[in-house]
């Protein structure tokens, strides 16, 4: 008979840590308000549980990327203001209105379309407007900004701008000159436009100081424990721990290989732990023969390739008392930082976190989920 409590892999989500990180942001940027960025299913932790925890802590504003995310979140946060970063493409306008979602408009064309919808519905529609200050992705570039500023009364007719938004390109590096350049550009843009609250800082921007806070900040990965500026001591509490269960322990002789491609060969008699976690679970394949895991706080190198459902560790030097088929190995969390995994995979902590697959159960602690 199968054990219903058995979980081969698990992502433990500490909702109290998410709330603690929210509180830290409040202390750092007050009196500016703090929203919650819960796009990509709350950076992989679970948007529903995270939103409920943040709402219980007093957060009343959330950001998502996709329309579908906003529709789902509305069921969880019926009275919250929910911004949709993707904007308002013509075919999304009816759903945005129906679900009371606030689009972050990214072009004059979107502004015109949203204004037309307001006229058709004979209502004043809320929006945020994104000003591109250097990312060159979404948002009004300089030429469109000038056109909006010169004819704002007409172009914004029937609209209520509740937020001017921009986004920092290099907030993870407090020494980057680009931060000050973008700050100056955003201030210049705001001086050209009708008054409304402004938002500039994401998690990294929160740590840049109150000059970057304006009226609202938008922390994302900081809420989830990311060390966004790679500080010697992470100011944010660890909110997610990824573990996999040891399925088998075996001893191999010197010269024997491990895994596909025989990419690892033992240089000594070696104890191998095979763990129920693989790239189908979101473990980065690139960390094979490069990354580490931890068992009872002791580090063990990943040896051989990461396969679809399994990964292998060299646990030869770990205390035998810590090793059994009941043992859990940590792949990020308390002993292994997200950023260390990202470095081993030559990627960003954001990808490590958001890559965790749906088949990995989320286990919530610290607050009602």
Outline where the language-model segments fall.
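Active-site anion/phosphate-binding pocket segments in diverse small-molecule metabolic enzymes
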Residues: 2-22, 27-29, 69, 88-90, ...
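Active-site-proximal beta-alpha core segment in soluble small-molecule metabolic enzymes
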Residues: 2-12, 17-20, 30-200, 213
